[in-house]
């Protein structure tokens, strides 16, 4: 099952499930979840191949929707779903295939259309970063700056880089994404 974090207590208001976008994680939504959890329970997930959730070669919207279905089923009642970007697409598939599990659906930063966006360049940049030799995330930023000029995008990607004495790694399954 997906890694899930829960904020707030169960109330009479429908729970909210927040689903992050590509290259993100539930961590991106924690501050918002905390702020809106005073009157309802809020759940944030790490989608497959992201954050602390499992890795799988199948990264289709259908498989992601099935993962979300398992989460909602474990909560034992329909939820409101906020889906951002990739998470929005997976949430749309979830709502179409399982309308009984979704009370309300809020989609952020994506439309129900087929996009021609290709993330292979960004994935290649991350895969080619020599992470084994890094001791600080700031060192990775200096290297990435040579091929990726957008400061905000670099910072976003580097949130998923784990620097550890036990070995550095991405919290992204770059081969599946």
Walk through the language-model features, giving the residues of each.
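Alpha/beta-hydrolase active-site loop signature
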Residues: 23, 47-51, 112
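Gly/Ala-rich beta-loop-alpha elbow adjacent to hydrolase catalytic centers
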Residues: 83-87, 91
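Conserved alpha/beta-hydrolase catalytic His-Asp/Glu region
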Residues: 132-177
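Flexible "cap/lid" loop of the alpha/beta hydrolase fold
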Residues: 92-96, 103-135
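Active-site glycine-rich loops that stabilize anionic/oxyanionic intermediates
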Residues: 21-24, 85
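Active-site loop/oxyanion-hole signature of alpha/beta-hydrolase fold enzymes
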Residues: 30, 34, 43-82
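Alpha/beta-hydrolase fold catalytic core
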Residues: 1-17, 37-40, 76
């Amino acid at each position: 099952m997906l890694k899930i974090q829960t904020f707030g207590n169960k109330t009479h208001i429908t729970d909210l499930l927040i689903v992050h976008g590509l290259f993100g994680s539930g961590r991106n939504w924690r501050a918002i979840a905390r702020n809106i959890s005073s009157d309802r329970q809020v759940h944030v997930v790490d989608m497959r191949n992201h954050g602390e959730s499992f890795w799988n070669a199948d990264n289709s919207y259908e498989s992601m929707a099935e993962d979300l279905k398992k989460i909602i089923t474990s909560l034992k009642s329909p939820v409101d779903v906020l889906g951002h970007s990739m998470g929005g697409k997976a949430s749309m598939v979830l709502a179409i295939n399982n309308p009984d599990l979704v009370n309300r659906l809020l989609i952020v930063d994506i439309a129900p259309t087929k996009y021609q966006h290709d993330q292979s360049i960004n994935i290649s940049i991350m895969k080619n970063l020599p992470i084994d030799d890094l001791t600080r995330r700031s060192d990775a930023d200096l290297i990435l700056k040579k091929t990726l000029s957008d400061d905000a995008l670099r910072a976003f990607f580097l949130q998923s880089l784990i620097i550890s004495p036990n070995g550095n790694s991405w919290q992204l399954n770059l081969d599946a994404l």
